[in-house]
Every structure is written in structure tokens, then in C-alpha cells.
Amino acid sequence: MTRPLLSLAIGLLLASSTAIADDMPTFRLLMKDGRFFPETIEVPAGTRFRLEVKNEGPGATEFESLELKKELVLAPGVTRSLVFFPMKPGSYKFFDDFHPETGQGRINAR
């Protein structure tokens, strides 16, 4: 009897966490030819959000932010997502370590 109840509880927990994640605002970032499009992303401060990152370039790229402690390497043609916890108002830098001269951007939380 305990095992079926535990399985049910785990199933409900997973279903509710998926529903919560689907309600999260999603912002899109395109990486191509060593650049970010857009270079600046405006997000609401104090709100958890998802950043969907897509590499449309011919080589590997990297989304990295030391301030936000996030790093993501993408092969050509790959799309991946990062979830950010609520941010304080401010401006947070990100960059592409493989293209340091051109791959610069910023997330503005307002």
C-alpha cells in the first residue's frame, strides 16, 4: 500500500513542477557568427524566467555569465534552455567565450 501512494505522490509532484515551469516567461536568444541577437534582453525583476538559447552558427558557441553563475555550450543547430531565479533590478553581463570580441550582451532586470 505504501509503494503505490509514494508513486502517486511523486507523479503529482512532477506534474505540478512541469505546470509551474510552463507558466514561466520565456525569452529567446539567438547566437550566430559570434554575436547575440538581441544583444540586450529586458526581463522583469523579481520574476523567475527561462532563457531559450539557439546556436544558428557554423561552430560551437557559449553563453556564459560570471555574475549570474550560468554557462552553456551549444553545438551548431542546438537549442537549450536556462532557468534564472528572480533577479534584483540591475544589468547583468553575458558573453561568448569562443568569440570574446563580438559575443557580448546584457540582461536588464527592471
Feature-to-residue mapping (PLM):
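N-terminal edge beta-strand
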Residues: D23-G46
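Beta-strand cores of secreted/periplasmic/IMS beta-sandwich domains, seen most often
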Residues: E39-G59, T79-M87, K93, A109
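Bacterial N-terminal signal peptides
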Residues: S7-S16
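N-terminal post-signal-peptidase region of extra-cytosolic proteins
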Residues: K32-E39, S65-L68, G77-S81
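Extracellular/periplasmic metallocenter environments
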Residues: D22-R28, L74-R110
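Bacterial N-terminal signal peptides that target proteins for export
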Residues: M1-S7
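Histidine- and aromatic-enriched segments that form or immediately flank copper-ligand environments
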Residues: E56-P76, Q104-R106
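Sec/Tat signal peptide C-region and signal peptidase I cleavage site
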Residues: S17-A21
